[in-house]
Every structure is written in C-alpha cells, then in structure tokens.
UniProtKB/Swiss-Prot annotation:
Glycans are attached at N57. It is found in: Golgi apparatus membrane. PANTHER family: ADENOSINE 3'-PHOSPHO 5'-PHOSPHOSULFATE TRANSPORTER 2, SOLUTE CARRIER FAMILY 35 MEMBER B. This is Adenosine 3'-phospho 5'-phosphosulfate transporter 2. Residues 22-42 are annotated as: Disordered. Keywords: Developmental protein, Glycoprotein, Golgi apparatus, Membrane, Phosphoprotein, Transmembrane, Transmembrane helix, Transport. Belongs to the nucleotide-sugar transporter family. SLC35B subfamily. GO terms for cellular component: endoplasmic reticulum; endoplasmic reticulum membrane; Golgi apparatus; Golgi cis cisterna; Golgi membrane. Mediates the transport of adenosine 3'-phospho 5'-phosphosulfate (PAPS), from cytosol into Golgi. PAPS is a universal sulfuryl donor for sulfation events that take place in the Golgi. Essential for viability. Involved in glycosaminoglycan synthesis and the subsequent signaling. May be involved in hh and dpp signaling by controlling the sulfation of heparan sulfate (HS). The modification Phosphoserine is found at S37, S40. InterPro entries: SCL35B1-4/HUT1 (IPR013657). It holds the Pfam family UAA. The gene is Papst2.
Amino acid sequence: MYIDTSASSRMTDNKGSVITINGGESAGNSPPSQRKSSTSESPPELRILCFDLTYYNRTTQFLLSCAGVFFLYILYGYLQELIFTVEGFKPYGWFLTLVQFGYYIGFGLVERRLEGYRISGGSFWNIEPEPRCIPMRTYLILAALTLGTMGLSNSSLGYLNYPTQVIFKCCKLIPVLVGSILIQGKRYGLLDFAAATCMCIGLAWFTLADSQMTPNFNLLGVAMISGALLCDAAIGNVQEKAMREFKAPSSEVVFYSYGLGFVYLFVIMLVTGNFFSGFAFCLEHPVETFGYGFLFSLSGYLGIQFVLALVRSSGAPIAATVTTARKAVTIAFSFVLFSKPFTLQYLWSGLIVVLGIYLNVYSKRNKLTLADVRQRIKQFGAKVARSPSRKFLIEV
C-alpha cells in the first residue's frame, strides 16, 4: 500500500497550532481579518476511521499512531506465521490471500459508509458511498499488482522462514531505486546507492545463513518474495499518480484494489481447481483458517490506517523509522514464539540491512552527492592541516 506524504508537509506548515473551544466561540465576535487568521491556523484533519485526533497535540498523535502500528503489525505477523504452522496448510497460501481480500472488501465497505455518515449524517445503513474518483482501468492495474504483492508474499511463507520474508520486505528500496532509474530516469544521491548496497549485502548474507540453517529452504520462496517486492514497488508509482491526479481517498483505493483483486484470484483458483481443495481444507480447520484469518486481516487493515495517520502527523521519514523498528521487533518475536534455528549471522546481516534503511531515511532530509563528498574531504583536509596538534607532531 503506497502512502501519500503530501499531508505530512501540510502538517509541518501548521505545527504547534491548536484551537480551543473558547477560541472558536470568540471568533464570531472577531473582525474578519482575525477570523481568517484563525481559520488558516487550523490544524490539518487527522482521523483514524471514525476517531478524530485532530486537536490532540503532536506528541499524543505520534504516540497513539506508534502504539497502533506496533500492536497491530506485530499481531499481524504473529497470526500470519501461526496460520502457516497448521499441519498441511503450506500449499494454500493463495487461498489465504483470497480469504484476506474477502475480509478487506467488508472492511472497506464499512469504512466508506463511516465516511459518508460523517459527512452527510442520516442513517448509517442508508448512506450512499462517495462516487468513484479514479478510472476503472487504473484500478484493474492496481488490483493485479496488489494481488501479486499479497499473494506472493503469503505463499512465500510455505518455503521461507518468516524472519527471512520480513528482511526481504525491508529491502523494497532496491527495486524502487532500479525501477525509477530505468523507467522514469530519476537521479539519486550517494546515500541512496550506499543504502541499496548495504541492503543487498545484508540480504544476501541473511539468505545464505537461512539456507544453511533451515533444512526446508527453497529458492522458490526467494523468487516469490522477490516478485512480491517488484509488484509492491510498482504499486507506489501507480497509486501516487492516481491519488494526486484524481484526489481519491485512501479508503476508495483500498476497497477497489482488493475488491478487483478478489475477483481476479477467485476466477484463477476456480479455473485451476485450487479453490475447492483450499476450501475443503479450511472447512476441516475453520478456527485456524477462517477465524485466525479474520483477525489477521483485521489487524492488517487497521494497521494501514495507523501508518497513514503516522505519515500525516509526523512525516514519511519518521514513519519509515517506526515501521522498520516494528519489523525488527516482529523478527525478535518470531524467534521467541516459534521454535526455529538461530545463528549470529542473522543478527549481523540484519544490522547491515537496518543501516541501509537508516541511510535511506537520512538521505530524504540530507541530499549528498559525490561533489558534496569531495568538498567535505577538502574541508576536512584543510582543517587538519591548520590544526595545532598536527603542527606539533610534525615538529617532533
């Protein structure tokens, strides 16, 4: 799910501005210029579903968003791995994706009705959702990419350790950077390439350790999660262009992307015959599949809302840092809650990936080119040459 960061810049422009109830009442007796100033200082709206966090201070908004991200996505990862521990479930990752998409359709309908109820009021069940903003042909592309991302990601767990899957997800910068250079002709700074290099080294080391420690390691899982990353990287470009051009709310994008993705996958599974075998297996284990699948889907859907709120309140770099920390905690929980072999190579390679993510976040605020590096080296050399200690050492 791509996250639009335009709201975060609006938040930065209005930081520290809070309007009290008394101030709002006194605005009616103020001159027009004062009323205009009061309106312009209103903080940007921040909502998580039907909960309005607009008039909380920024620290409270940040803490609430962080708490939601950590709790929901740690629960999401735990339930995802728990479902795949059910004996005989590993071949049915695509059916889990179908169940997840079905739940997302229901959640999306409820969210769109909540938005309509908040805007127009009236009876909740008689609310008509807002008309679609983005053309259907764009959603057909988004649905295919969403299906590739979620389906390949879920199915890869049948062949990979969960920590390995998470490490791959941390390295989405690599396909994004390569695709942006080849397709859009973008230019990146030195820190971006350093970040991608660290991620590649850490990822290769982690995968090598996993292949040595895990007896059921399969390169098909690596291919699946790599395909999921490529689809996820493409989703960002398509969603960014569509949401900015047509001013579509995120609830609409989620609803149509997963709704059409459900139709795609349902037809494919009917044609291949995998639907009936997956459905029969889930009927034999309804709690472990449909029950856990509901909580798994609900935590993922709500997690998207909290990440969006975190981006709007604190900005994309901070949101990226928080989600990276969440992934590190998820990996730690995976080793603690599910028995699996461990080696220190996991730790060191994971730290290299984290370094790459930090460099990527740092580069968003501090653009560094090769010319900047040469300039700083010259400045450092000149400073050392003028240093008294340097002169003393030469004289000795």
